[in-house]
Amino acid sequence: MRCVILSACPVSPELKRLLRPDDFIIACDAGYRNCAPLGCKPNIILGDFDTAPCPVQQNDDIIVLPHVKDDTDTEYAAKLASEKGFTEVLLLGALGGRRIEHTLSNLATGLGLEERGVRATLQDERSRITFVRPGETRAYPKEEFFYFSAFPMEGRAEGVCERGSYYELTDDVLVAGYPLGVSNEYAEGSDCITISTRKGALVVVETMPDTPILTGNKA
């Protein structure tokens, strides 16, 4: 089974398509409000409930966390999912909103899951975020996404190779101070992009297009 973590950023019913009947759902704090648009029921609700009152619902497992703690509610949920033996976690409601620091924090949570052997995905209505660990090659078949961006998650990534994209990389270095990997696209005739890194983890962002654009242009 897969674990789905619902964080507090509001989501649209459009994301209901991502859920599976056997998903184990953990709602974090105000993230339980996302259950209604997604048409799902949480298995666990947890948080310090500083952004929403603690719900009173029958048959729900509710974990009340202290306000003073090292882990965010989403990080606590991620560790709980790992402890329960899930090998795949989808985070919804973890991107955007009025607290950009939580988006950055949730990226760190995603990488932490990967480091514990759990495949992590963060997704919203327009973008999907995944990770590539050192020594790993991941394939990204062409789906509804258009833009393909890769950034060094640990400040520097060496030996980065990317194939099937408009701007290919061969044993390249990506650094935090220069966004070389932003806004790539699938090469003409390509139905899959593969990317690998020898040293340093990557965060990969796939994004849908806004309007028809000219291939080969970077903003």
Residue ranges and their predicted role:
Residues 1-55:
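N-terminal beta-strand-loop-alpha-helix module at the start
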Residues 6, 26-29, 47, 64, ...:
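General beta-strand structural signal in soluble alpha/beta enzymes
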Residues 60-67, 117-121, 146-151, 156-157:
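A glycine-rich helix N-cap at a beta->alpha junction
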Residues 62-84:
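Short phosphate-binding loop-to-helix
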Residues 100-111:
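Short Gly/Thr/Asp-enriched flexible loops that form oxyanion-binding sites at enzyme active sites
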Residues 112-128:
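Short, acidic/small-residue loops that bind anionic groups at enzyme active sites
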Residues 127, 132-219:
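Long, charged alpha-helical interface segments
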